[in-house]
Amino acid sequence: MRSTLPPPPLRVLIAEAHPIVVLGLADLLKTLGYMLVGSVASGPEAILAAGEHQPDLMLVDVDLKGEMDGITAAIEIHTRLGIRSVVLAEHCDRTVQTRAAEAALFAVLDKTSPVSAIADVLRAAPLRLIH
Protein backbone atom coordinates (compact mmCIF):
# COMPACT_ATOMS: atom_id res chain seq x y z
CA MET A 1 0.00 0.00 0.00
CA ARG A 2 1.32 3.39 -0.98
CA SER A 3 1.81 6.12 1.58
CA THR A 4 -0.22 9.24 0.95
CA LEU A 5 1.73 11.49 3.24
CA PRO A 6 1.51 15.16 2.37
CA PRO A 7 4.67 16.76 1.02
CA PRO A 8 6.93 18.38 3.59
CA PRO A 9 6.19 22.04 4.28
CA LEU A 10 7.92 24.71 2.23
CA ARG A 11 11.00 25.89 4.15
CA VAL A 12 11.39 29.69 4.09
CA LEU A 13 14.15 32.02 5.28
CA ILE A 14 13.34 35.71 5.84
CA ALA A 15 15.85 38.53 5.27
CA GLU A 16 14.23 41.65 6.72
CA ALA A 17 15.65 44.47 8.86
CA HIS A 18 12.43 45.28 10.75
CA PRO A 19 11.47 42.79 13.50
CA ILE A 20 7.76 43.70 13.39
CA VAL A 21 7.65 42.83 9.68
CA VAL A 22 9.42 39.53 10.41
CA LEU A 23 6.72 38.70 12.98
CA GLY A 24 3.95 39.42 10.48
CA LEU A 25 5.59 37.35 7.76
CA ALA A 26 6.28 34.50 10.19
CA ASP A 27 2.61 34.48 11.18
CA LEU A 28 1.56 34.39 7.52
CA LEU A 29 3.96 31.51 6.81
CA LYS A 30 2.57 29.56 9.77
CA THR A 31 -0.99 30.17 8.56
CA LEU A 32 -0.03 28.78 5.14
CA GLY A 33 1.55 25.69 6.71
CA TYR A 34 5.11 26.68 5.77
CA MET A 35 8.16 26.36 7.99
CA LEU A 36 10.22 29.40 8.95
CA VAL A 37 13.83 28.23 9.18
CA GLY A 38 15.28 31.56 10.30
CA SER A 39 15.42 35.31 9.90
CA VAL A 40 18.32 37.69 9.35
CA ALA A 41 18.69 41.44 8.86
CA SER A 42 21.55 41.91 6.37
CA GLY A 43 22.66 40.66 2.97
CA PRO A 44 25.80 38.86 4.18
CA GLU A 45 23.77 37.20 6.96
CA ALA A 46 21.20 36.10 4.36
CA ILE A 47 23.88 34.48 2.21
CA LEU A 48 25.36 32.61 5.18
CA ALA A 49 21.96 31.55 6.56
CA ALA A 50 20.81 30.34 3.13
CA GLY A 51 23.88 28.12 2.92
CA GLU A 52 23.31 26.82 6.42
CA HIS A 53 19.53 26.25 6.30
CA GLN A 54 19.05 25.46 2.57
CA PRO A 55 15.52 26.91 2.42
CA ASP A 56 13.20 26.24 -0.50
CA LEU A 57 12.44 29.95 -0.82
CA MET A 58 13.68 33.28 0.55
CA LEU A 59 11.60 36.33 1.49
CA VAL A 60 14.01 39.24 1.04
CA ASP A 61 13.46 42.93 1.71
CA VAL A 62 15.17 45.28 -0.74
CA ASP A 63 16.38 47.53 2.10
CA LEU A 64 18.50 45.37 4.39
CA LYS A 65 20.94 46.55 7.05
CA GLY A 66 24.43 47.34 5.81
CA GLU A 67 25.78 48.08 2.36
CA MET A 68 24.37 45.07 0.46
CA ASP A 69 20.77 45.47 -0.69
CA GLY A 70 18.29 42.62 -0.79
CA ILE A 71 18.29 42.17 -4.55
CA THR A 72 22.08 41.82 -4.59
CA ALA A 73 21.85 39.27 -1.76
CA ALA A 74 19.06 37.38 -3.55
CA ILE A 75 21.09 37.26 -6.77
CA GLU A 76 24.13 35.95 -4.89
CA ILE A 77 22.03 33.30 -3.12
CA HIS A 78 20.44 32.18 -6.38
CA THR A 79 23.81 32.07 -8.16
CA ARG A 80 25.56 30.11 -5.41
CA LEU A 81 22.75 27.89 -4.16
CA GLY A 82 19.94 27.95 -6.72
CA ILE A 83 17.47 29.27 -4.13
CA ARG A 84 14.87 31.69 -5.48
CA SER A 85 13.52 34.71 -3.65
CA VAL A 86 10.37 36.75 -3.26
CA VAL A 87 11.64 40.32 -3.00
CA LEU A 88 9.66 42.73 -0.84
CA ALA A 89 10.00 46.44 -1.54
CA GLU A 90 8.55 49.40 0.30
CA HIS A 91 8.49 51.23 -3.01
CA CYS A 92 8.31 48.77 -5.88
CA ASP A 93 9.42 51.13 -8.65
CA ARG A 94 10.54 50.28 -12.17
CA THR A 95 14.21 50.03 -11.13
CA VAL A 96 13.43 47.40 -8.49
CA GLN A 97 11.20 45.49 -10.91
CA THR A 98 13.82 45.60 -13.68
CA ARG A 99 16.68 44.46 -11.44
CA ALA A 100 14.58 41.62 -10.04
CA ALA A 101 13.39 40.52 -13.49
CA GLU A 102 16.96 40.50 -14.84
CA ALA A 103 18.00 38.35 -11.90
CA ALA A 104 15.19 35.82 -12.53
CA LEU A 105 13.97 36.10 -8.96
CA PHE A 106 10.74 34.34 -8.05
CA ALA A 107 8.58 37.44 -7.52
CA VAL A 108 8.63 41.09 -6.50
CA LEU A 109 5.97 42.40 -4.15
CA ASP A 110 5.25 45.89 -2.91
CA LYS A 111 5.11 45.89 0.90
CA THR A 112 1.88 47.88 0.64
CA SER A 113 0.21 44.93 -1.12
CA PRO A 114 -2.69 43.37 0.75
CA VAL A 115 -1.76 40.33 2.84
CA SER A 116 -3.97 38.27 0.53
CA ALA A 117 -1.74 39.16 -2.46
CA ILE A 118 1.39 38.12 -0.58
CA ALA A 119 -0.37 34.91 0.52
CA ASP A 120 -1.38 34.17 -3.10
CA VAL A 121 2.24 34.43 -4.27
CA LEU A 122 3.43 32.20 -1.43
CA ARG A 123 0.68 29.63 -2.11
CA ALA A 124 1.83 29.45 -5.74
CA ALA A 125 5.48 29.03 -4.73
CA PRO A 126 5.58 25.22 -4.32
CA LEU A 127 4.18 24.66 -7.81
CA ARG A 128 6.36 27.28 -9.48
CA LEU A 129 9.52 26.12 -7.72
CA ILE A 130 9.07 22.59 -9.09
CA HIS A 131 8.65 23.65 -12.73
Model-derived regions: residue spans:
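A short, hydrophobic beta-strand element within the central beta-sheet of small alpha/beta folds
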Residues: 82-94
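Alpha4 helix (beta4-alpha4-beta5 surface) of REC/receiver domains from two-component response regulators
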Residues: 91-109, 113-120
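Active-site residues of response regulator receiver
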Residues: 61-63
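Non-catalytic signal-transmission and effector/linker regions of two-component phosphorelay proteins
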Residues: 1-11, 116-131
